[in-house]
């Protein structure tokens, strides 16, 4: 084999390798941004689980990835790491009956907005993942974030018990799950709980269930378990087992 052939082979391999690295770098460049706030009509009739009595306007923002609208969101975003953040999704739901006839020029009459799950958004990969928070209830749970911890009042699957819950993103089970009170889905205060309050040192969370005294719990801090993947494969959605 001539030296020229060997040199050509190495040059080809170097070119292919460089091209692959360049392609990978280009593929991972994403621009993730939240748009400006806008107000949309909102009501308890359209979102019976989450809307407060008398609430008629919802402030929303678009989530853009590379200039493309991916989701609508509501409320404040929380930075979990320097590349990932969480924000609550809002869903635009078709409220038209099969018998309803479209009204020319009216694009909004048969659509309603509903508060949805929390999303984990990765600024590097541009990927958004719905978080599966244990015992999370869209109408009851007001989430208070600290680091990668979510604290909120949760409702058990039987809908008979109200729990104090602290969940860690990507954790396999709740960091805290303590019963606060019995829960009556047909007759309960609105809101059921105010947003919990965090304290850093010592790490402590205080819950505020309606109609009773506040309850505090000390939390033993641990290391983050969130894996921010940079590969091309879809990540397994962060999941937490329920009781």
Show where each model-derived region lies.
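Exposed acidic/polar residues on beta-strands and adjacent loops within beta-sheet cores, strongest
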Residues: 23-243
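Bacterial N-terminal signal peptides
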Residues: 8-17
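Domain-scale selection of a single, long terminal region
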Residues: 16-20, 24
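Secondary-structure junction/capping motif
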Residues: 2-3, 16, 243
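Bacterial N-terminal signal peptides that target proteins for export
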Residues: 1-9
